[in-house]
């Protein structure tokens, strides 16, 4: 929000410098982002009076003027402005005057006549960009005075930034309250703006969606002149606030919004049938805005309609039928209070302006009626018209009654760290407009209606500190009450080791936010409960991640859209899930994840280009696991996993504990996530790698190895891994290297069988194995496989 310092000082004028005033605004919790010292770039412009106006002999578009600027000689000026006429007082740039953009006024001949100056519009003075008519001053303005001094243009333009919980500071009134409290001043009571009804015409209000809309105020004003010019005093303030419009009604609404912080809406009353109905939209209803922009609605959108059509949506989103224009004569002025829980939804759904969101979030229910009266008063004074009575409808109004909060003196002193006298605290609370009752050791307080952010005792303490000023808080050493957890050196070591291995394999490390889009997470993990944030940065970052995969897939899509043909990325970090057995009901684990997509190698003349596959990623993962533990402690079990291809996915186990998963992206998610079918991912939890024993170093045997190969037929549904594991169990007391070197799947003629080729390499540390010993062990192993898997030895 931007505003002029002079506008603020009209409401509250502490005897402090501008610099200190700006600091006080920031100290009140409303950040001052920027202060611009405004000085208009024109000089030599004075007020003049047109005493003679005739048409130019050679042009019907030009007029020859005689202008009095308070000197003996009248100036001869040629002008083509449409509103140029005899008797009005205007801004005259005399010969030698300078205007913005380094324009200097000189005496010159136009169509054969001398012009000794120029009549100026606001645009030519660098003020209002859309105002090209020459300036007309009130009749009582003195001729010859300096226009620069008359306009009092020198001012400080202050830009403030607020957080979503402090919309009370998003108005001149709200800022004045804060500054008054800091300086122990009182702002003047709001002026009486009561406008009595002249006509009894009104529009009925029917609130059907009473959970979403708390109340609705509205009145009709008839016979207004919407084409009048906006008064200069209002133009200047709105210009400095960067919201000046050509429409006087829009300007008045903006003026009330900035001054009081109360959003109002205006509709063309002639296009409203009978009544206004506040309801939820129906299925497949549409709203058409100006320029035929169409908004498709659903049953979750609050609308304001009449019996035939939708009129508007919250946030001043008006239908093209009822939006005011230059032909509007009768208007309906309204204010409504929306449930704050609903506002966040509609803001994100309709992509409303953030500032307007904060205004609607911070509507003061006790100021709505006054805001309508104030706007009505301004409209009648500037545009004329006759007002009807204010029609008001209230529902669930008790929702906005602030609760009583108990503030304990001992608690306040403990949090602040030193003693503040009760009289000082009471005085500060009164300055902040709290209602309070002191009871020896505590206060029962009720915050003002515009401070809905005050919910608990700590909020009140924070408010007191703002006024007491943080600079007055005594500096004392910090007391630590920390429950520090021991650093997991093993996990840190595993992360560093894994990163080195992956980087050497051509991977790039990425870092993503721990906050992700719940829609994306639900696509990948539809059966998992999301851990939602109560005050997210944005809707796309509103839940904690369950996995590193959503971030990696977003990175894959980003790089794919930038024509990257070979992508290898990895990430490590914390993931969060709901677990009532854990402290605070949340479990957090450190995960390592990687993703690959595209070509295995870059394009070259020597190697054939192929796509990366499941086994490329599995091999890289095994390189990591081999550096952590024995590979025979790792098991890959085929399993259907949400988010992964049902035929290319596996769970990963370490000593029979599930530690992660690996596979190709589910084809059903490719389009939604904008990734290709050649995208593969793995993810493992590093929390499960505990009690890892150091690798044993053994002396290499001096005796030769002996190899035996067998081929067996088993059912194709039996995993080769299970067969190999059974062989390892059989030879657990011998030094035997067992390897699967061949798989061949038969067709239906062999009853869905597959052949496994298995090699056994024997070695003894003390002697050479004899053939009969090895043959006997192989026969016994085959017997176990026959019994366990109905395996048949191929001859």
UniProtKB/Swiss-Prot annotation:
Limits of the B5 domain: 400-475
CC terms in the record's Gene Ontology section: phenylalanine-tRNA ligase complex
GO molecular function: ATP binding; magnesium ion binding; phenylalanine-tRNA ligase activity; tRNA binding
Taxonomic superkingdom: Bacteria
Residues reported in the UniProt entry to bind Mg(2+): 453, 459, 463
Gene Ontology biological-process entries: phenylalanyl-tRNA aminoacylation
Keywords, in A-Z order: Aminoacyl-tRNA synthetase, ATP-binding, Cytoplasm, Ligase, Magnesium, Metal-binding, Nucleotide-binding, Protein biosynthesis, RNA-binding, tRNA-binding
Catalytic reaction equation(s): tRNA(Phe) + L-phenylalanine + ATP = L-phenylalanyl-tRNA(Phe) + AMP + diphosphate + H(+)
FDX-ACB domain mapped to chain residues: 701-794
Cofactor: Mg(2+)
EC supergroup of this enzyme: ligase
InterPro entries, per the entry: aa-tRNA-synth_II/BPL/LPL, B3/B4_tRNA-bd, DNA-bd_dom_put_sf, Fdx_antiC-bd, Fdx_antiC-bd_sf, NA-bd_OB-fold, Phe-tRNA-ligase_IIc_bsu, Phe-tRNA-ligase_IIc_bsu_bact
Family as reported in the entry's similarity comment: Belongs to the phenylalanyl-tRNA synthetase beta subunit family. Type 1 subfamily.
HAMAP family in UniProt: Phe_tRNA_synth_beta1 (MF_00283)
Protein name from the UniProt record: Phenylalanine--tRNA ligase beta subunit
Protein species of origin: Buchnera aphidicola subsp. Acyrthosiphon pisum (strain APS)
Source organism phylogeny: Bacteria, Pseudomonadati, Pseudomonadota, Gammaproteobacteria, Enterobacterales
């Amino acid at each position: 929000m931007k505003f002029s310092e002079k506008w603020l000082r009209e409401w509250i004028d502490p005897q402090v410098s501008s610099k200190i005033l700006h600091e006080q605004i920031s100290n009140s919790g409303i950040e001052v982002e920027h202060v611009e010292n405004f000085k208009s770039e024109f000089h030599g412009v004075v007020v003049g009076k047109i005493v003679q106006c005739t048409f130019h002999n050679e042009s019907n578009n030009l007029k020859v003027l005689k202008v009095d600027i308070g000197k003996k000689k009248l100036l001869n000026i040629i002008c083509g402005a449409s509103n140029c006429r005899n008797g009005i007082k205007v801004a005259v740039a005399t010969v030698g005057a300078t205007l913005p953009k380094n324009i200097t006024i000189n005496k010159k001949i136009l169509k054969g006549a001398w012009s000794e100056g120029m009549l100026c519009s606001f645009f030519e003075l660098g003020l209002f960009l859309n105002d090209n008519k020459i300036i007309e001053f009130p009749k009582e303005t003195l001729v010859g005075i300096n226009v620069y001094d008359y306009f009092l243009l020198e001012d400080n333009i202050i830009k403030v930034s607020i957080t979503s919980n402090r919309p009370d500071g998003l108005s001149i009134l709200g800022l004045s309250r804060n500054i008054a409290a800091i300086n122990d001043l009182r702002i003047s009571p709001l002026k009486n703006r009561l406008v009595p009804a002249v006509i009894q015409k009104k529009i009925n209000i029917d609130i059907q969606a009473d959970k979403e809309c708390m109340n609705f105020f509205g009145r009709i004003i008839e016979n207004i002149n919407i084409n009048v010019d906006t008064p200069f005093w209002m133009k200047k303030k709105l210009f400095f606030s960067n919201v000046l419009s050509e429409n006087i009604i829009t300007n008045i609404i903006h003026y009330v919004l900035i001054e009081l912080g109360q959003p109002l809406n205006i509709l063309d009353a002639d296009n409203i049938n009978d009544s206004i109905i506040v309801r939820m939209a129906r299925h497949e209803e549409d709203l058409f805005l100006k320029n035929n922009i169409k908004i498709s609605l659903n049953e979750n959108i609050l609308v304001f309609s009449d019996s035939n059509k939708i009129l508007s949506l919250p946030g001043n989103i008006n239908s093209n039928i009822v939006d005011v224009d230059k032909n509007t004569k009768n208007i309906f002025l309204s204010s409504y209070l929306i449930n704050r829980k609903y506002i966040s939804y509609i803001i994100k759904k309709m992509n409303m302006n953030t500032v307007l969101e904060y205004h609607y979030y911070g509507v003061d229910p006790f100021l709505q009626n006054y805001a309508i009266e104030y706007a009505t008063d301004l409209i009648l004074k500037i545009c004329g018209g006759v007002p009807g009575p204010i029609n008001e409808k209230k529902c669930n109004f008790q929702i906005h009654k602030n609760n009583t909060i108990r503030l304990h003196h001992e608690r306040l002193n403990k949090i602040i760290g030193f003693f503040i006298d009760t009289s000082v605290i009471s005085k500060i609370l009164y300055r902040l407009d709290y209602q309070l009752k002191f009871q020896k050791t505590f206060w029962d307080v009720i915050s003002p209606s515009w401070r809905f952010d005050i919910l608990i005792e700590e909020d009140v303490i924070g408010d007191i500190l703002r006024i007491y000023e943080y600079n007055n808080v005594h500096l004392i050493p910090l007391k630590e009450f920390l429950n520090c957890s021991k650093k997991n050196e093993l996990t840190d070591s595993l992360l560093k080791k894994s990163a080195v291995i992956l980087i050497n394999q051509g991977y790039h490390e990425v870092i993503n936010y721990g906050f992700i889009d719940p829609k994306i997470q639900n696509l990948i993990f539809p059966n998992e409960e999301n851990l939602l944030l109560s005050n997210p940065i944005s809707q796309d970052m509103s839940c904690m991640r369950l996995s590193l995969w959503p971030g990696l897939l977003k990175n894959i899509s980003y790089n794919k859209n930038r024509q990257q043909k070979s992508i290898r990325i990895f990430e490590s970090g914390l993931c969060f899930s709901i677990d009532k057995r854990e402290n605070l009901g949340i479990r957090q684990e450190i995960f390592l994840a990687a993703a690959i997509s595209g070509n295995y190698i870059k394009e070259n003349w020597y190697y054939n280009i192929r796509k990366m596959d499941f086994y490329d990623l599995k091999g890289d993962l095994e390189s990591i696991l081999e550096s952590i533990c024995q590979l025979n402690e790792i098991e890959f079990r085929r399993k259907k996993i949400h988010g992964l291809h049902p035929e290319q996915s596996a769970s990963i186990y370490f000593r029979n504990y599930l530690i992660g998963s690996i596979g190709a992206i589910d084809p059903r998610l490719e389009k939604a996530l904008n990734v290709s079918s050649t995208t593969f991912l793995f993810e493992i939890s590093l929390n499960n790698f505990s009690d890892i024993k150091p690798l044993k170093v053994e002396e290499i045997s001096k005796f030769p190895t002996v190899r035996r190969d067998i081929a067996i037929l088993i059912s194709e549904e039996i995993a080769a891994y299970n067969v190999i594991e059974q062989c390892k169990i059989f030879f657990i007391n011998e030094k035997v290297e067992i390897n699967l070197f061949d798989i061949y799947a038969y067709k239906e003629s062999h009853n869905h069988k597959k052949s496994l080729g298995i090699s056994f390499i024997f070695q003894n540390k003390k002697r050479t194995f004899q053939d009969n010993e090895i043959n006997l062990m192989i026969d016994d192993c085959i017997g176990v496989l026959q019994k366990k898997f109905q395996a048949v030895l191929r001859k």
